[in-house]
């Protein structure tokens, strides 16, 4: 945990881990959580401070997602986000503590609830941080499908490390290729492009001729891009 804390003190997890047991364990290790509540989560507004004796109230009225009290929250303006998003500090019954809550009302009217146990984070930071979880999952998904992450049958640690690193390195190289050439972010298209380019090169190599590249450049490009166009 000390090595991880030197990098970041935030752990991003999906809604399955939005429980007091997981949050308490992470808190004891020094980590904050950025996650998502289930749609039926019980949340309360933070009550205003009252000048009276006794213990102050921890939670106020329950948050009704169908009838939000906009005076208790701040609207977020995020480029590219469909619908509307609001942020506020709220009491979460599942975690038994106050969190930084982001309510995203999608165009269809359905709400998604994102939160962070680090109260100093802004609502925009919570959403951006949670979105990084998908980028990590996409790396594993694409590596499994296209760069052989699960294909290695070795049993030694060093051999497995090499195979895993080679898989992720190939994926990163493909993403750099996509970015440099202004292509759609699709590994399937890149794989088809590489296969067709290699197959075209193999045909010319087997024929043992050196064609005029200037004359056939257009034809080669059509051959290479034939499969994506046909799909």
What do the PLM-derived regions correspond to, one by one?
Residues 18-23, 123:
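Short, well-ordered alpha-helical microsegments
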Residues 1-10, 102:
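Short, basic/hydrophobic alpha-helical segments
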Residues 22-32:
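Short, surface-exposed basic-aromatic patches at helix termini and helix-loop junctions that form
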Residues 10-18, 33, 114, 134-143, ...:
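Short, conserved catalytic/metal-binding motifs centered on acidic residues
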Residues 12-16, 35-37, 91, 104, ...:
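Short His-Asn-centered micro-motif
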Residues 123-154:
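Short amphipathic alpha-helical "interface-anchor" segments enriched in bulky aromatics
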Residues 31-42:
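Acidic, His- and aromatic-enriched active-site or binding-groove loops in soluble protein domains
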